[in-house]
Amino acid sequence: MSTPEYSTSAKSRFDITNLTTDPFVVATWSVAMISWVIAFIGSIVANIEGSFPRFTWWGLVFQLLMLVFLPAVYCFDVVEWYRLFLTCGYSIAFIYTTNSATNLVWSGGSATGAASAGVILLSMVNLIWVFYYGSDNASPINQWIDSFSLRGPKRSSVSPFHNSRPISHDKYSGSENDEFKHSSWNNQRYMSSTALSGLENVSQGDTLETTPFNSPDHDGLGTNITAGGTNITIDEFPYTARALYNYQKSPDDENEISFEKDEILKVNDIHSRWWQAKRANGEIGICPSNYVELIE
């Protein structure tokens, strides 16, 4: 399984709004920082008053490093690069904090009680982060959480090019990629392999005639194929969808399209995470399915 590539130059600029526009991260990180301060101060006082489990200190230091790292990856917009690291890191932090809670919760004194309360809260936040960063952005829970973000849902980590879209095969073309770049995605009319099922053996002498999107002869985009005296009309974009959020296409994927919130799109191939779509201006490309909703 391949993963999408990101441009370092486009993704490495510091922008704090990447963090502040995500209420889930702001809320959980704030709770974690307050919990860490409580646990740290309680641990200092408990250590002064008497014996204190020394391994807890390393757990608190490791937790602090992870807490500092999280806002950094958001501000530089490189979260997708470090999802695996975040999942593993917070899993380790969860083990440390739960172990510290076990040692502290049964100890007497108000200081150890405060420290145990802090590490218990940290354990809860760590577990939430493990589930969140360990899940794909297209999962139902992540989509629900990201729906509160001002930037909208995040991209799925599954590559749209290799895993979601059917590729049109041309027996006269030497390369599928070349056909894709020079034929399908330069606003030329094309037909997917799904639509051509059973019609692949059209001879060179047969004619292929395409009807424009806004043609008065058809309500939707259609393709007329004349093969052996047979007329067949196929609607390439039979569905209509409305954009739920603004979407800016990735600079590294020329097959994507940008669109604005509430824009109406014509789509097909709705059984995957990335849909083939056509804008009103005739631009054709792919869009993430969690950014749009079908209206007919």
Curated annotation (Swiss-Prot):
Gene3D superfamilies: SH3 Domains. The keyword Cell membrane applies. It is found in: Cell membrane. GO terms for cellular component: plasma membrane. It holds the Pfam family SH3_1. Keywords: Cell membrane, Membrane, SH3 domain, Stress response, Transmembrane, Transmembrane helix. Residues 1-23, 78-83, 132-296 are cytoplasmic. One of its GO terms (biological process) is regulation of actin filament polymerization. The chain crosses the membrane at residues 24-44, 55-77, 84-106, 111-131. InterPro entries: SH3-like_dom_sf, SH3_domain, Sho1_SH3. It is a multi-pass membrane protein. Signal peptide: none annotated. Residues 236-296 form the SH3 domain. Residues 45-54, 107-110 are extracellular. Its main location: membrane. Disulfide bonds: none annotated. Plasma membrane osmosensor that activates the high osmolarity glycerol (HOG) MAPK signaling pathway in response to high osmolarity. PANTHER family: FCH AND DOUBLE SH3 DOMAINS PROTEIN, HIGH OSMOLARITY SIGNALING PROTEIN SHO1. Forms homooligomers. Belongs to the SHO1 family. This is High osmolarity signaling protein SHO1.
